[in-house]
Amino acid sequence: MRIVFAGTPDFAATALKTLLNAGYDIVGVYTQPDRPAGRGRKLMPSPVKQVALDTGIPVYQPVSLKPEEAQQELASLQPDVMIVAAYGLILPKAVLNIPTHGCLNIHASLLPRWRGAAPIQRAIAAGDAETGITIMQMDEGLDTGDMLLKLDTPISADDTGGSLHDRLAEMGGKAIVQAMERLAKGDLTGEVQNEAEANYAHKLSKEEGHIDWSRSAQEIERLIRAFNPWPGTFTDLGEQRIRIHQASALKQGSDKGPGTVIARERDGVDVACGTGTLRITSAQLPGSKAQSINDLINGGKQVLLPGQELN
């Protein structure tokens, strides 16, 4: 079966490597154009492109798939199926119709929950008990196509956006291989999504990481985990922007206003929240690396002291 793979970041690269290791015939790889990265802002290939280069697969990097020439180029590959994972380009209906079996998407949620760009982080921030991978038959909507296969995983109390991303990337590879095996046997059937259960995982922004201390400690703790490693969470102490890397939610409340530091011990800094108390255990001061509160105290830093106001 002739497969065209379309994807860009590490999540997609993991699935591509799994397909290659399973012996599938990838006749072409579509990925985003090279982007500037690093201190030198040098043009760098996407993780998916790097896998393709390492394995000798032809790479295609159109800015858009809307032009007829781009669609003709794809059609010339004569794909039986196109597998899409975090590609980053909209696929017009004409493209969806080119492969014999259409386009299959690897989506990092249990659809119809968390359609959209940031399902991994949104699931953690919302306090979901589980998430997973859905293999979906793509249509013209945003993650609205028929569901073909699902794998689920619990979200643990210490999962971060990073740890859950890596686990789901591995699961995505397993799921698409299972789907391809069923497709070859002719028993891959779709289930229509229930629109009443659908919600959207909107794209993340850096500003969303600004901690609102009027929220509950539990909500803030989940946000810190969800946004680790990107876009990260932060709070301001006067003119200083302090990044928060790890924290835990405590049930006990305080008579202090939200954002007030109420204690600083070696095991953490306690901050009053709208409900409960947040214990910060790892933070990053301007111009410094992330460090434990114990190390921060050992360094003599006079920040995050009782009575100080964070906002």
UniProtKB/Swiss-Prot annotation:
Q: What is its EC number?
A: 2.1.2.9
Q: Which reaction does it catalyse?
A: L-methionyl-tRNA(fMet) + (6R)-10-formyltetrahydrofolate = N-formyl-L-methionyl-tRNA(fMet) + (6S)-5,6,7,8-tetrahydrofolate + H(+)
Is Iron-sulfur given among the entry's keywords?
no
One Gene Ontology cellular component term attached to this UniProt record is: cytosol
Among Gene3D superfamilies, the record links this protein to: Formyl transferase, C-terminal domain, Formyl transferase, N-terminal domain
The UniProt keyword set, sorted, is: Protein biosynthesis, Transferase
Q: Which domain of life is it from?
A: Bacteria
The family database entries (Pfam families) matched by this protein are listed as: Formyl_trans_C, Formyl_trans_N
Q: Tell me a Gene Ontology molecular-function term this record carries.
A: methionyl-tRNA formyltransferase activity
**Binding annotation for (6S)-5,6,7,8-tetrahydrofolate:** 109-112
Q: Does the keyword Hydrolase apply?
A: no
* Function, in words: Attaches a formyl group to the free amino group of methionyl-tRNA(fMet). The formyl group appears to play a dual role in the initiator identity of N-formylmethionyl-tRNA by promoting its recognition by IF2 and preventing the misappropriation of this tRNA by the elongation apparatus.
Give the protein family: Belongs to the Fmt family.
Q: What is this protein called?
A: Methionyl-tRNA formyltransferase
